[in-house]
Design a protein with these regions (language model features):
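Transmembrane helical cores of multi-pass secondary ion antiporters/exchangers
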Residues: 1-304
Length: 304
């Protein structure tokens, strides 16, 4: 499976066809072969696939953020990436929700909730597929797809909360609450990033970066599941800071934030660990995702 995934990556670079699509198709074919031999008990995938998906999304966004070179001249491309993500996401939500209402017959706001995941330009697909692009275009894809993930998750949880309360999706009070959550997650992300950065410098054990990844994933889950915050912002901020801390820390604050114990070798080691882990988790997630799709769902028009 690892060899196939590696070959798919090489093929994606040369053909610009997303390697993750090939992995999903491979999983679907494997499911068909397995079912033809009478192996149909795949209930364990209902638990495994979401876990791999969460870890994979975190690692993909982290890897992308670590590679970004943040400078003043990059503000324009960051702004363009954000605006493109927001506009495309909103247009997609409107169009897909209308399709669900008119063609499938889903009621509103259920159609909107179903439309949101399909409207996101997922970084899990876009970032790996952009590996063969020139740096400028690759950076734009990273920013646009990452912002699409973040905005999509925020809108999704916002919509679910509104439906659970029996309130309209658009209103002044809930929108102000959403803005407050964004401000809160940014503040928490900065605090957690500072603590993890200090922890990297203080750990003397030869195995420390897996601990940092574990703490980062734990913080993400607490923010997403318990606090109901858009925790992908945390991953994005941590990755950008760790990859650009020498440029991002103002001179007057450098005496409070020590960076002497974090060298280029440490960053290279962390980048390598993140890249290898991302490749491994991404491989098994999309394979198992394709494997988890019931074959009969391709001819079913009724939503789950």
């Amino acid at each position: 499976l690892i060899i196939f995934s590696y070959l798919f990556d090489i093929l994606a670079i040369r053909t610009k066809f997303p390697s993750v699509i090939l992995l999903v198709f491979t999983g679907i074919i494997a499911r068909f072969i397995s079912s033809s031999y009478g192996f149909d008990n795949f209930e364990f995938l209902d638990t495994l696939v979401p876990v791999l998906g969460t870890i994979g999304l975190i690692l993909i966004v982290l890897e992308a953020a670590l590679e970004l070179d943040i400078k003043k001249e990059k503000i324009q491309i960051i702004t363009k990436g954000f605006m493109a993500a927001l506009i495309i996401l909103l247009i997609n939500i409107v169009l897909v929700s209308i399709f669900f209402e008119k063609v499938i017959g889903l009621p509103n706001p259920t159609s909107v909730i179903y439309a949101i995941p399909l409207s996101i330009i997922s970084s899990a697909v876009a970032i790996p597929s952009a590996s063969g692009l020139i740096n400028k275009n690759k950076e734009f894809v990273v920013y646009e797809s990452t912002f699409s993930d973040i905005l999509g998750i925020m809108i999704f949880y916002y919509s679910i909360r509104q439906v659970e309360k029996g309130e309209a999706l658009i209103g002044l009070e809930p929108i102000l609450t959403l803005v407050g959550q964004i401000v809160l997650i940014i503040i928490l992300s900065l605090a957690i990033t500072y603590l993890l950065f200090q922890l990297i410098q203080r750990i003397e054990h030869h195995v420390k970066f897996f601990l940092i990844l574990a703490l980062l994933i734990l913080s993400y889950e607490i923010g997403k599941d318990i606090l109901k915050l858009p925790s992908l912002v945390l991953i994005f901020i941590f990755g950008i800071f760790l990859g650009n801390f020498s440029n991002l820390i103002p001179e007057r604050f450098k005496k409070y934030v020590k960076t002497d114990n974090v060298g280029k070798e440490d960053l290279h080691e962390f980048n390598l660990l993140t890249a290898e882990s991302t490749f491994l988790v991404r491989t098994f997630f999309f394979l198992f995702f394709g494997f988890s799709i019931p074959l009969e769902s391709f001819i079913e028009m009724e939503p789950y």
